Curated annotation (Swiss-Prot):
It comes from the Eukaryota. It comes from Pongo abelii (Sumatran orangutan). Gene3D superfamilies: Tetratricopeptide repeat domain. The lineage of its organism: Eukaryota, Metazoa, Chordata, Craniata, Vertebrata. Belongs to the TTC27 family. Pfam families: TPR_16 (PF13432). PANTHER family: TETRATRICOPEPTIDE REPEAT PROTEIN 27. This is Tetratricopeptide repeat protein 27.
Length: 843
C-alpha cells in the first residue's frame, strides 16, 4: 500500500507519517506536490497545476462529448505518458479524482463556494457548443442521470463530480496501485446518489461491491491507526445501507463500529429541571455515555477538534420559561467522557438509525432530543455539529416555545455555507461519517419552515431561487392559487423544456398529455413520468392503465418504495392477487419495517388461499407496528384459520388493549370449539391445554362487554355449561348463564316474537336445571334456597308473559306452539318449590 493512502482517507497525516514520507522520497515527487495540496485543503491549486493542465490540454473537436473527452484524456495519460512511471501516473490520477470529489463536496455541501471554473483547466474547444457555463452544467447533469431519475438542476460545479466519477468509478480498474480506491469509489457513489430524486439500483450495486472489496483489505485496519479508520468505514457503510432500506445491515455495521470503540450508550432517566420556575427535580430523559475501555486513547490518529468560533453557533432558546438545557440534580453522576471525532460520529449514527427505525411519535422525539443534547454538549466538529443542529430544528419546529429558535437556527445553518472564515479542511473532518445534507436541502428546510409559519411569500422566494418548482407548486396549490402554479410552470417551460417540469404541469392540470410529453423528452427513460401518470390513473380508478404505467416505472428503477406499494394497491383493486403479492413482497424487501405493506401482503396471500404465508407476513407486520388494531384483527382471523389458537388468544388480548369494547363472537366460538373438542393446532399440540388461557380471556372480555348474552353463554361453556364434575365450575357456569339470561330479557322486543320467546324459555329452563344441580352442592341451605328462588321467579315471569301475550282473546286459549313449554315450566316451578321447601326444613 502507498503509505499516504491512510492519511488521505483520514484527511490529515501524523508527524510520524510525514517523517516516513520524507525518507521514502514521497515529498519530492510529482504526486508528492499533489498530496501536499490535497492535505492542505487547497484542491483548486491541483487543477491549476501544470501537470493537470497537460493531462487535459489535448485538442478535441467541438462535437466530442465532454465525458468521452475527459475519460479519453485520463486513460491516455495512464497508458501512454512517458514522462512518469506507471505507479506515479496512477497516484497522480487518483489524487486528482479525490480532489475533484472534495471540491464538489465543498461546492455543494460544506462551502465556502469554490472559485474554480471548467475553463481554468479544460480545452476551450469543449465550450464552443455552449453559450454560457449554465448550458455546460445542464449538459453535464444530464450525463449524471441514472435509472431514469432526475438530478437537482442547480447542482454547483457538476463537472467536478463527472471527473471524480470517471476516475474513481469508470477507470478504477486501471488504478491497481491504489489499494484504498474502493473506499473512495464508495464515497463518490454516496455523493452522487444524494443528487438523484430516487434511489439508484445501479449505484447501490456498485456501493455493495465497494464495501465487499474494502472488507477484504486486511492491512487497512491494522494497529491503532486502522482502528480509527475501521470505525469511520463501518459508519459510512451503515449510512449507505440505511439509505437503501437495508436496516438490518445498517444496524450490524453500527454495532461493529460501537464494539470497536467500546462505547456504551443508554437512554436513561435522571432527576433534573426543565423550566426556570420548577421547584422540584423530576425524572428527565438523557443519554448516558460511557467508555468500557480505552482503545481510542491514541489521539494522533483522530482529527483535532475545530475551534468553537469556526463551528455553527448553537443558538440559545431565549424562552422566559423553558431552560436552554436540562439542569441535572447531580451533574457528576452522568459526567460524559471527552469524546473523540469517531465516538461522536458513532452517537450520531446510533441516533440516525434510531430515527429511521421508530415511528413519528412524541416519545421518539424526546429520545432523539436526548441524543442531540448529548452531541451538542461537546461542540468539536463542523459535520457533527451541523448534523445535530439540523435534526434538532426538525424536532423543535412543532413546539410553539421552540419554533422561533428552530427558524433562527435553520437560517444560521443556511448562512454558514457562504462563510469563508472556516477552512474547508475543518469542515471536511469526519464529513463522510455524518451524512450532512447538501446546502440547498438546508435552504429548502428553511423555506418549508417559513411556509408552515405562514410566511408564504418568503418561502416562495427561497423555493424559486432554488428552482425547486415542485415546492413552488405546492405553495401555490395550498394557497388556492392554482392558476399561478400553472403560469409559473409554463414560464419555465418557455425557457427550457424538461421532463420534470412537464411532470409538474401534469400534476397541476391532471393532464396525461403532459406526462406523455415528459416521457418523450426523456427518450422513454423517465421513471418519474410513468410514476406520475400512474398516480393520475389511480386517482381516476383506472386500475389497468395504472398498473401498466407503474410496471414501466419500476422496470426503469426498481428501488421506488412508494411505487411498489401503490402498484400493489392497484393490483388488489383489480383482484390480481398474484400481482399484488409480488408488488408488496418487493415493498417489504426494500423496507422491512413497512407494517402496512406486510399487512397488504398478507391480504394477498389470504386471497390466494396461502394462509400460512399470510400468518407469517402478519407476524412481520406486527413487529413493525404493534399499535395498528386493523393488523391485529387480520392476525387474529388468520391465526384461527391456520390453527394458531394460542396466538389468537394473545391477539384478542392485544385488541382489548387497543380497543376497549372489542368483541368478535365468531373468533370466540372457534376458540371454544378448539378447546372443548380437543382440536390440534398447527404444531400438533392439543388445544385443551389452552383452557386456562381461554377462561382468562373470557373473564377479560366479559369485564369490558357486559351486555352480550351470547358471549356469557360461551363463557359458561368454557366451564362445562353446568354439566361439569367440578362443583366450582358449575357454580361459575350458573353465574355466566344467569347474566346471559339477564342480557336476553333486557334486549328489545324478544317477548313479542314467539320464536324469540321460545328461545328465552329454553334458556330459562336450562338455567333452572343448572341451579338444581348447583343447589345440591351448596353447604348453606339459605344459599341454595336463594339460588332456586331466583330461577323460579324467572320461570313465573315467563309464564305470566306467555298468558299475557300469547292468549287468544276470543277463545281464551294459549298458543299451541307454547303448550309444551308452558307444561315444562309449570312442572319445573313445582319441582323448584318442593326442593326449596326441603332446604328450608334444614334451617
Amino acid at each position: 500500500m502507498w503509505t499516504p493512502e491512510l492519511a488521505i482517507l483520514r484527511g490529515f497525516p501524523t508527524e510520524a507519517e510525514r517523517q516516513q514520507w520524507k525518507q521514502e522520497g514521497v515529498v519530492g515527487s510529482e504526486s508528492g506536490s499533489f498530496l501536499q495540496l490535497l492535505l492542505e485543503g487547497n484542491h483548486e491549486a491541483i487543477f491549476l497545476n501544470s501537470m493537470t493542465q497537460n493531462i487535459f490540454s489535448s485538442t478535441t473537436t467541438a462535437e466530442e462529448k465532454i465525458d468521452s473527452y475527459l475519460e479519453k484524456q485520463v486513460v491516455t495519460f495512464l497508458d501512454y505518458s512517458t514522462d512518469l512511471d506507471t505507479t506515479e501516473r496512477q497516484r497522480l490520477i487518483f489524487l486528482l479524482g479525490v480532489s475533484s470529489l472534495q471540491l464538489f463536496v465543498q461546492s455543494n455541501w460544506t462551502g465556502p463556494p469554490v472559485d474554480l471554473h471548467p475553463q481554468d483547466f479544460l480545452s476551450s474547444v469543449l465550450f464552443q457548443q455552449f453559450s454560457e457555463v449554465k448550458g455546460l452544467d445542464a449538459f453535464v447533469l444530464s450525463l449524471l442521470i441514472l435509472d431514469g431519475e432526475s438530478i437537482y438542476s442547480l447542482t454547483s460545479k457538476p463537472i467536478l463530480l463527472l471527473l471524480a466519477r470517471i476516475i474513481l468509478v469508470n477507470v478504477r480498474h486501471k488504478l491497481t496501485a491504489i489499494q484504498s480506491l474502493p473506499w473512495w469509489t464508495l464515497r463518490c457513489v454516496n455523493i452522487h446518489q444524494h443528487l438523484l430524486e430516487e434511489r439508484s439500483p445501479l449505484l447501490f450495486t456498485l456501493a455493495e461491491n465497494c464495501i465487499d472489496q474494502v472488507m477484504k483489505l486486511q492491512n487497512l485496519f491494522v494497529d491503532d491507526s486502522g482502528r480509527y479508520l475501521a470505525i469511520q468505514f463501518h459508519l459510512e457503510c451503515a449510512y449507505v445501507f440505511l439509505y437503501y432500506y437495508e436496516y438490518r445491515k445498517a444496524k450490524d455495521q453500527l454495532d461493529i463500529a460501537k464494539d470497536i470503540s467500546q462505547l456504551q450508550t443508554d437512554l436513561t432517566g435522571a432527576l433534573g429541571k426543565r423550566t426556570r420556575f420548577q421547584e422540584n427535580y423530576v425524572a428527565q430523559l438523557i443519554l448516558d455515555v460511557r467508555r468500557e475501555g480505552d482503545v481510542l486513547s491514541n489521539c494522533e490518529f483522530t482529527p483535532a477538534p475545530t475551534p468553537q468560533e469556526h463551528l455553527t453557533k448553537n443558538l440559545e432558546l431565549n424562552d422566559d420559561t423553558i431552560l436552554n438545557d436540562i439542569k441535572l440534580a447531580d451533574c457528576e453522576q452522568f459526567q460524559m467522557p471527552d469524546l473523540c471525532a469517531e465516538e461522536l460520529a458513532i452517537i450520531l449514527g446510533i441516533c440516525t438509525n434510531f430515527q429511521k427505525n421508530n415511528p413519528v411519535h412524541t416519545l421518539t422525539e424526546e429520545e432523539l432530543l436526548a441524543f442531540t443534547s448529548c452531541l451538542l454538549s461537546q461542540p468539536k466538529f463542523w459535520a457533527i455539529q451541523t448534523s445535530a443542529l439540523i435534526l434538532r430544528t426538525k424536532l423543535e419546529k412543532g413546539s410553539t416555545r421552540r419554533v422561533e429558535r428552530a427558524m433562527r437556527q435553520t437560517q444560521a445553518l443556511a448562512d454558514q455555507f457562504e462563510d469563508k472564515t472556516t477552512s474547508v479542511l475543518e469542515r471536511l473532518k469526519i464529513f463522510y461519517c455524518c451524512q450532512v445534507p447538501p446546502h440547498w436541502a438546508i435552504q429548502r428546510q428553511l423555506a418549508s419552515l417559513l411556509f408552515e409559519l405562514g410566511c408564504t411569500s418568503s418561502a416562495l422566494q427561497i423555493f424559486e431561487k432554488l428552482e425547486m418548482w415542485e415546492d413552488v407548486v405546492i405553495c401555490y396549490e395550498r394557497a388556492g392559487q392554482h392558476g399561478k402554479a400553472e403560469e409559473i410552470l409554463r414560464q419555465e417551460l418557455e425557457k427550457k423544456q424538461t421532463p420534470s417540469l412537464y411532470c409538474l404541469l401534469g400534476d397541476v392540470l391532471g393532464d396525461h398529455s403532459c406526462y406523455d410529453k415528459a416521457w418523450e423528452l426523456s427518450r422513454y427513460r423517465s421513471a418519474r413520468a410513468q410514476r406520475s401518470k400512474a398516480l393520475l390513473h389511480l386517482r381516476n380508478k383506472e386500475f389497468q392503465e395504472c398498473v401498466e404505467c407503474f410496471e414501466r416505472s419500476v422496470k426503469i428503477n426498481p428501488m421506488q418504495l412508494g411505487v411498489w406499494f401503490s402498484l400493489g394497491c392497484a393490483y388488489l383493486a383489480l383482484e390480481d392477487y398474484q400481482g399484488s403479492a409480488k408488488a408488496f413482497q418487493r415493498c417489504v424487501t426494500l423496507e422491512p419495517d413497512n407494517a402496512e405493506a406486510w399487512n397488504n401482503l398478507s391480504t394477498s396471500y389470504i386471497r390466494l388461499k396461502q394462509k400460512v404465508k399470510a400468518f407469517r407476513t402478519l407476524q412481520e407486520a406486527l413487529k413493525c407496528n404493534y399499535e395498528h388494531w386493523q393488523i391485529w384483527e387480520n392476525y387474529i382471523l388468520t391465526s384461527t384459520d391456520v390453527g394458531e389458537f394460542s396466538e389468537a388468544i394473545k391477539a384478542y388480548h392485544r385488541l382489548l388493549d387497543l380497543r376497549d369494547k372489542y368483541k368478535d363472537v365468531q373468533v370466540l366460538k372457534i376458540l371454544l370449539r378448539a378447546v372443548i373438542d380437543g382440536m390440534t393446532d398447527r404444531s400438533g399440540d392439543v388445544a385443551t391445554g389452552l383452557k386456562g388461557k381461554l377462561q382468562e380471556l373470557f373473564g377479560r372480555v366479559t369485564s369490558r362487554v357486559t351486555n352480550d348474552g351470547e358471549i356469557w353463554r360461551l363463557y359458561a361453556h368454557v366451564y362445562g355449561n353446568g354439566q361439569s364434575e367440578k362443583p366450582d365450575e358449575n357454580e361459575k357456569a350458573f353465574q355466566c348463564l344467569s347474566k346471559a339470561y339477564k342480557c336476553d330479557t333486557q334486549s328489545n322486543c324478544w317477548e313479542k316474537d314467539i320464536t324469540s320467546f321460545k328461545e328465552v324459555v329454553q334458556r330459562a329452563l336450562g338455567l333452572a336445571h343448572v341451579a338444581i344441580k348447583c343447589s345440591k352442592n351448596k353447604s348453606s341451605p339459605q344459599e341454595a334456597v336463594q339460588m332456586l328462588s331466583s330461577v323460579r321467579l324467572n320461570l313465573r315471569g315467563l309464564l305470566s308473559k306467555a298468558k299475557q301475550l300469547f292468549t287468544d282473546v276470543a277463545t281464551g286459549e294459549m298458543s299451541r306452539e307454547l303448550a309444551d313449554d308452558i307444561t315444562a315450566m309449570d312442572t319445573l316451578v313445582t319441582e323448584l318449590q318442593d326442593l326449596s321447601n326441603q332446604f328450608r326444613n334444614q334451617y
